Amino acid sequence: MAKHVKVAVTGAAGQIGYALLFRLASGQAFGLDTTVDLHLLEIEPALPALKGVVTELEDCAFPLLCNMVVTSDPRVAFNDVNWALLVGAAPRKAGMERKDLLEKNGSIFAGQGKAINENAASDVRIFVVGNPCNTNCLIAMNNAPDIPKDRFYAMTRLDQNRAIGQLALKAGVDVPSVKNMIIWGNHSSTQYPDFYHATIDGKPATEVIRDKNWLLNDFIPVIQQRGAAVIKARGASSAASAANAALDSVWSLINTTPADDNYSVALCAQGQYGVDEGLIFSFPCRTENGVVSVIEEIEHNEFGQQKLKETLDELREERDAVEALGLI
């Protein structure tokens, strides 16, 4: 029997939104057996541009796309939705400190959390793309007290996909040969792209790629700084690759994970790996019959433990900063 899902997308007229919506409407996130309503949220000045995007969506005549709502009111956007994809966020501008960015986005995500809490469907799931996504997710979660904390996620799949691509290039293999590539922690330059537990054609990545210097001193910094490299090269942040990773994430959160693999997503920690309960931290996860769980039996060497500590410390600092601002 055909299924139906209502999906809110914030920042819908932005570059990521533009790269995301057509693929959402064609069934690439929820499957070809699921019809979709799109609730599109934008700030008032961007509504004319969003109407242009809606015109294009209509012109595609997607069989799975049923209804579209265009609004600048979060209460309307989140009304009765099953998924809220929080893509829109205030960009970091020249001279802006990270604290300023947290404050500016904090008010946006606090308001959206409240609106989701009051208006969304009882089974709503929230996926945050807008940066700093871990802490934006934390803010939304803490402003939606009636929604179970395990329904909130932030995106680290883009980092995972970047890492898989780099390992495949270095090893001279196809992308599907690389599995179990884990991103730990924050979606920032402190993230830990964990090649030690990755596999290539079923073997440990460190056995296939024997160049330890490359793994430690090239691979990790390249993944950590990849977003900045894209901005430098094209004058704008990652859009198509971010939209692609968001679709991958939603698919992985819904569908059962293959037995020989896992995926990375940031979610509300419950004390796993020594991470403070309530922090939004990226872990290796699996989905089984619609239930998402963190893989808990992974052991870290000394290097890995240090990397986990670095990214955990940063997330604690961000949490403390938004707490001081009264956002959580």
UniProtKB/Swiss-Prot annotation:
Alphabetically ordered keywords of this record: NAD, Oxidoreductase, Tricarboxylic acid cycle
Catalytic activity: (S)-malate + NAD(+) = oxaloacetate + NADH + H(+)
Membrane-crossing segments per the record: none
Enzyme type, top EC level: oxidoreductase
Domain of life per record: Bacteria
Gene3D superfamilies the record matches: Lactate dehydrogenase/glycoside hydrolase, family 4, C-terminal, NAD(P)-binding Rossmann-like Domain
Chain residues that bind NAD(+): G11, A12, A13, G14, Q15, I16, G17, N105, Q112, V129, G130, N131
Positions with a binding annotation for substrate: R92, R98, N131, R162
GO biological process: one example: malate metabolic process
Pfam families from the UniProt entry: Ldh_1_C, Ldh_1_N
Single Gene Ontology MF annotation: L-malate dehydrogenase (NAD+) activity
Residue numbers annotated as active site: H187 (proton acceptor)
Its EC number(s): 1.1.1.37
Function: Catalyzes the reversible oxidation of malate to oxaloacetate.
Similarity field: Belongs to the LDH/MDH superfamily. MDH type 2 family.
PANTHER family hit by this protein: MALATE DEHYDROGENASE
Protein's UniProt name: Malate dehydrogenase
Natural source organism: Coxiella burnetii (strain Dugway 5J108-111)
Gene this protein is translated from: mdh
